[in-house]
Regions:
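Beta-strand-rich ligand-recognition modules
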Residues: 78-85, 170-200
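Low-complexity, Pro/Ser/Thr- and charge-rich linker/hinge segments at domain boundaries
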Residues: 115-138
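Short, conserved beta-strand segments of beta-strand-rich sandwich/propeller modules, principally
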Residues: 49, 91-95, 155-157
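Recognizes extended acidic, P/S/T-rich segments that occur
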Residues: 54, 61-91, 97, 101-108, ...
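Aromatic-lined ligand-binding clefts that engage carbohydrates, nucleic acids, or primary amines
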Residues: 147-150, 154-172
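Short beta-strand elements bearing conserved aromatic residues within extracellular beta-rich modules
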Residues: 50, 66-68, 166-168
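C-terminal motif of bacterial Sec signal peptides marking the signal peptidase cleavage site
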Residues: 17-19
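Pro/Thr/Ser/Gly-rich low-complexity, intrinsically disordered linker/stalk tracts
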Residues: 23-58, 111-120
Length: 200
């Protein structure tokens, strides 16, 4: 009986340790966001904020450490540091790995993306377009330009700035779901812009 009890206690202890480790391995970072947005495009910050949640069977999971890895290719991610320089008009891939309160590594998240836009005025190559009317002229101006692309486009972005509101159409289809973009501001001090993915 003594040998059986000893064997039973050892088996339970071993099972308990393995179960705890297995439980932590099931904890995975989910709902990855950049600047509180999912898969955003048009971020104009060189130091974006990364956030995520935890999904797993452990109710009171507490992470002791996390590591964000980032890169321009999902197959070549490097540890993210505060002094890392992000480039404008670039898609970045990132994921996060966490360690539990005991220092054991947990699952790595799936890879998320974000895309930078313009960081400074010199990143702009477009020029302002306007009608010749005074600002008191009430009818809203409409601008139209026809052009033909000489090659296939892999990806396309449109950056629209307006001293007021705009609606953008390409091939007769309205671009974007929002109205009253790019939003009100003091137009004598700053002009906002919106980024659209118009690849399709």
């Amino acid at each position: 009986m003594v040998k059986k009890n000893t064997l039973l206690i050892c088996s339970l202890a071993f099972f308990s340790l393995m179960g705890c480790k297995g439980k932590n391995e099931l904890t995975v970072p989910v709902n990855l966001r950049t600047e509180y947005l999912r898969e955003p495009i048009g971020l104009d910050t060189k130091s974006p904020r990364f956030t995520w949640e935890y999904k797993g069977s452990e109710k009171n999971f507490l992470a002791s450490r996390s590591e964000i890895r980032i890169g321009t290719s999902p197959d070549n991610l490097q540890p993210y540091t505060d002094n890392m320089t992000l480039e404008p008009h670039t898609r970045y891939y990132w994921n996060v790995t966490v360690w539990d309160q005991d220092g054991d590594i947990c699952e790595t998240s799936e890879t998320a993306t974000f895309e930078t836009a313009k960081f400074k005025s010199s990143d702009w190559s477009g020029k302002w377009i306007t009608d010749s009317h005074d600002k008191e002229f009430e009818p809203a101006p409409m601008f139209r330009k026809a052009f033909t692309l000489g090659k296939e486009i892999e990806e396309a972005r449109v950056y629209v700035a307006a001293a007021g509101y705009y609606d953008l159409f390409i091939n007769g289809k309205r671009v974007g779901e929002n109205y009253l973009d790019p939003g009100y501001t003091h137009f004598d001090k700053r002009i906002l812009y919106v980024t659209h993915d118009v690849t399709s």
